[in-house]
Amino acid sequence: MQDKLIARAKELLAEGKVQKVVGWKKGLFDDDITPAVFTSAAELDKDFVFNKFCKANLSKYLVGITRQIEIAKSTTRMNNTMAKQRDPNAKDAPIPQEVVLVFLKPNDTYSFTQLLKENRITRGDVYAIGVPCQDTLDGGEVCETCKNKKPVSCDELIGVEAEPAPVQSTRMAEVEKLEAMTADERDAFWKNEFSRCLRCNACRDICPACTCERCVFDNNKLYTSQKVAETSFEESLFHIIRAWHVAGRCTDCGECSRVCPQHIPLYLLNRKFIKDINEIYGDYQAGSDMETKPAMLTFNAEGDPETTIVWERSKEREAE
């Protein structure tokens, strides 16, 4: 499979259809695989790998790459306009056209599609190829609770079926175990987990749903960027707020838990939100297609039993 991917990437580069390739690169050890950008056939032959250790979801890297592509286009257009103002006969500089090739496993394509829906990635700047997951070695958190092996929003598929057999997912089983606990038991569980947090921000930085250019947790004026938490409340604050911020947009890719150096099961927080959203608003899988409206960004006056709740509660506060 690795040879097929390299051959296809080299072919697209040679044809000029893509100018960059986002894939995986081997490090010092066989299991030390990291995302990488390739720009030539020689680089692909030397460093590109695809095996069971290629765990990283590559979709988020497209946010920064396509942003730079669009900035280059906008800068050229602006320069052309300014040149015309100085000299009406000035010739326009050609608008740079750059396309990046990315290899996405079925699970990763959901993150890619969700980013497209949120306009965080420009579709014309990306050529997406769906590749098989090969039951990636990830410690079990992702592949053992796979939600679907069907790739979405890809331009091409290599070694993966467009309509694979449905997956019998058991990913909500752990959430149900937490729900069966008493409030005190859940409180003790999460306090124990969050007490190990280093605030390294790895979960935020890897999360495809966390794409804000300026994060609230990097604000020194609000004292939200500190690394040391004085109380258990502060330890939980970061993770709970982040879970709220990605609610309805999290595709359950599992990257947050995969990169956590303390092995905190952060995916359980996100799955609890997903489970509640499905029960309250109906089945919804973020990133499953481009058409379905996000559950948390949709308002239906006919189906909302409390359409006047804001007005009524504001009146209650005024009366107090």
Residue ranges and their predicted role:
Residues 1-190, 194, 208:
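Iron-sulfur-associated redox domains of electron-transfer enzymes in respiratory
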